[in-house]
């Protein structure tokens, strides 16, 4: 590889430098997926004579948590200094990832048997949730980073 194409010889330091921006750019993926899964839940809420009212998922709590996380994200962006908010960004992406997995699961169950077909929007969203959980830094990496920064 030509020397002119080498960004750095210290990959660990480079990763630490770009990490806040890298995480911040990924968060809207999770927020958008949560929003569209919540919309799917709403769209299917009254199917089959309202049977979904008996599901024990707290959809209103999901919506409230989504709004809180979204507000936290935009407050960080408004501050303009992502580097000073690394801990918050790590926690935020992790919280969004776990909420996304929960909401997507609820969306599939809420959608009934048609939600289990390979090309249903619920299954697509479920795959998006798994992708977000596995997107570097993964939920595992975020937990490790949190532990390292705390201690």
Question: Which residues are covered by each model-predicted region?
Answer:
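Glycine-rich beta->alpha junctions and the first turn(s) of the following alpha-helix
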Residues: 1-67
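Residue-level signal for pocket-adjacent positions within structured domains
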Residues: 9, 13, 111, 121
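Generic structural signal for well-ordered, non-transmembrane alpha-helical segments
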Residues: 32, 60-67, 90, 94-101, ...
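C-terminal helix-coil-helix/basic helical segment that borders enzyme active sites and/or dimer interfaces
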Residues: 46, 66-98, 105-117
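Glycine-rich phosphate/cofactor-binding loops in nucleotide/flavin-utilizing enzymes
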Residues: 113-151
């Amino acid at each position: 590889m030509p020397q002119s194409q080498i960004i750095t010889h210290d990959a660990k330091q480079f990763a630490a430098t770009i990490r806040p921006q890298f995480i911040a750019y990924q968060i809207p993926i999770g927020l958008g997926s949560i929003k569209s899964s919540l919309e799917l839940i709403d769209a299917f809420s009254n199917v089959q004579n309202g049977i979904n009212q008996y599901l024990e998922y707290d959809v209103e709590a999901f919506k409230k948590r989504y709004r809180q996380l979204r507000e936290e994200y935009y407050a960080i962006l408004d501050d303009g200094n992502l580097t000073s908010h690394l801990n918050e960004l790590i926690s935020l992406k992790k919280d969004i990832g776990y909420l996304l997995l929960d909401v997507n699961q609820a969306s599939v169950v809420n959608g009934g048997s048609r939600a289990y077909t390979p090309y249903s929007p619920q299954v697509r969203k479920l795959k998006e949730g798994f992708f977000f959980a596995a997107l570097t830094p993964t939920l595992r990496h975020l937990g490790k980073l949190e532990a390292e920064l705390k201690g």
